[in-house]
Regions:
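Positively charged n-region of N-terminal signal peptides that target proteins for export
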Residues: 1-4
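Sec-dependent N-terminal signal peptides
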Residues: 6-10
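C-terminal motif of bacterial Sec signal peptides marking the signal peptidase cleavage site
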Residues: 15-16
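Flexible "cap/lid" subdomain of the alpha/beta-hydrolase fold that forms the substrate-access gate
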Residues: 22-38, 42-46, 51-54, 86, ...
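Conserved HGGG/HGGXW glycine-rich cap/lid loop of the alpha/beta-hydrolase fold
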Residues: 50-98
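A short, glycine- and basic residue-enriched loop/turn
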Residues: 68-69, 137, 297
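Surface-exposed alpha-helical interface segments used for non-catalytic interactions
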Residues: 70-73, 77, 113, 140, ...
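Catalytic histidine-centered segment of alpha/beta-hydrolase-like enzymes
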Residues: 297-309
Length: 322
C-alpha cells in the first residue's frame, strides 16, 4: 500500500512538472516588434526605430559617436514590453539624411533642432531621455528648451562635467575648434576611419581577455555610414563643434540643479574617454540621482545590455513611471 501511495505521489509530481514545462513553452517572452520608420522634416528624412504600445510612457534613446540607433538594437526589446521606445538616428548618421557638409554646417544645435522636431512630429510631449556620448549635447539642448517635458534622465557615459575629461581630452576638443589647419583636419578625419572606429572606439576600453563581448556588428554597421568623404566630413564638423558643449556645461549643470530631474546614471567605469569622475560629478547637482558604475567601457549598452535594462525598469517602476 505504501508503494502505491509513493508511486501515486511521484506520478502527480512528474505530471505537475510536465505541465509546468508545457505552460512555459506556451508562455515564452515575446517582446513587441521593432518597426523601422522615416519622418520627413523640412524636406529632410529622419530615421527612427520604434517599439511598444504608444499608450505607454515614452523612452527616447539618443545615440553617440560613431553609431546610430543601431547601438540600441538589443536594449529596445528589453524595454518595449512596458514602454513606448523611440530611437532616432541623428541627422548625418545612420539611415537619416546625410546633407552635404559643404552646404550644411553640422553642429549640435542642428542635431538637437531636428531631433526635437521629430518628437513634435510624432506628437511626443513628455518622455524619459536616455543619453550616451553625443546624445548628451543633443539631449541637454532639448532639455534647456523644454525642461518640463523630461520625466526622467538616464545618463550612460554622457558627459556634462569637466571632471569626466582629462586635461588632454579637454585640449583635444578645444583645439578641434580653434585649430583650422590642414594638419588638424587630417588628424580629425583619420579618427573617422576604420582603424580608429574599431580600435580607438569600440575596442579601446577592452583587453585581450574580454574582446569577445563586443559585437563586430556594431562597427560593421557604423562603417557603412562612414564610407564616403562626405559622411566622414560630417563627423569632422561635429568634432570641431564639440567644444561648444564644454562651454555649455555650466548652463546644463545649473539647469539640472534647478529642475532636479529623476536621474539614473549607468556608467561604464572603464571608459577612458569619459571617465567615471564624470558620472560622480552629477551628484554635486543631483544628490538624489541613482548611480551605478558598471564593469564596462564607453559602449556599456553594447556590453551590459541586460544589466542596464534591469536598472532602467526598476528605476522607472520605483518612480512610478509606468
Amino acid at each position: 500500500m505504501k508503494h502505491l501511495i509513493i508511486i501515486a505521489i511521484l506520478s502527480l509530481a512528474l505530471f505537475g512538472c510536465n505541465s509546468i514545462k508545457e505552460d512555459n513553452k506556451n508562455n515564452f517572452f515575446l517582446p513587441p516588434a521593432t518597426t523601422y520608420n522615416y519622418a520627413e522634416i523640412d524636406s529632410v528624412k529622419l530615421f527612427y526605430r520604434a517599439a511598444g504600445d504608444k499608450k505607454n510612457p515614452v523612452i527616447v534613446l539618443l545615440h553617440g559617436y560613431p553609431s546610430s540607433s543601431h547601438s540600441y538594437r538589443n536594449l529596445i526589446p528589453m524595454l518595449s514590453t512596458h514602454y513606448y521606445v523611440i530611437a532616432p538616428d541623428n541627422l548625418g548618421s545612420g539611415y537619416s539624411s546625410h546633407l552635404d557638409p559643404k552646404t550644411t554646417k553640422y553642429t549640435f544645435d542642428l542635431l538637437a533642432n531636428y531631433t526635437q522636431k521629430l518628437l513634435e512630429t510624432l506628437h511626443i510631449e513628455n518622455y524619459v531621455m536616455y543619453m550616451q556620448d553625443f546624445g548628451a549635447p543633443v539631449g541637454y539642448r532639448m532639455m534647456m528648451e523644454n525642461p518640463n517635458r523630461i520625466d526622467a534622465l538616464i545618463v550612460q557615459n554622457a558627459n556634462a562635467y569637466l571632471d569626466g575629461l582629462t586635461e588632454k581630452r579637454q585640449n583635444f576638443f578645444r583645439t578641434a575648434q580653434t585649430d583650422t589647419s590642414k594638419t588638424k583636419y587630417d588628424f580629425l578625419y583619420s579618427l573617422t576611419g576604420k582603424d580608429a572606429v574599431v580600435n580607438k572606439q569600440y575596442l579601446f576600453d577592452l583587453n585581450e581577455t574580454n574582446m569577445n563581448i563586443q559585437s563586430p556588428d556594431a562597427w560593421t554597421h557604423d562603417l557603412v555610414f562612414l564610407n564616403s568623404k562626405k559622411d566622414r566630413d560630417i563627423q569632422v564638423q561635429l568634432f570641431q563643434d564639440y567644444n561648444t558643449n564644454l562651454l555649455s556645461y555650466p548652463k546644463w549643470q545649473n539647469m539640472l540643479k534647478e529642475n532636479q530631474p529623476k536621474t539614473l546614471i549607468t556608467w561604464g567605469k572603464k571608459d577612458l574617454k569619459f571617465n567615471a569622475n564624470g558620472a560622480k560629478a552629477y551628484l554635486k547637482d543631483l544628490p538624489n540621482a541613482e548611480l551605478h558604475l558598471l564593469d564596462a567601457g564607453h559602449f556599456a549598452a553594447e556590453e551590459k545590455t541586460r544589466e542596464i535594462a534591469e536598472l532602467i525598469l526598476k528605476f522607472l517602476d520605483k518612480h512610478d513611471i509606468k
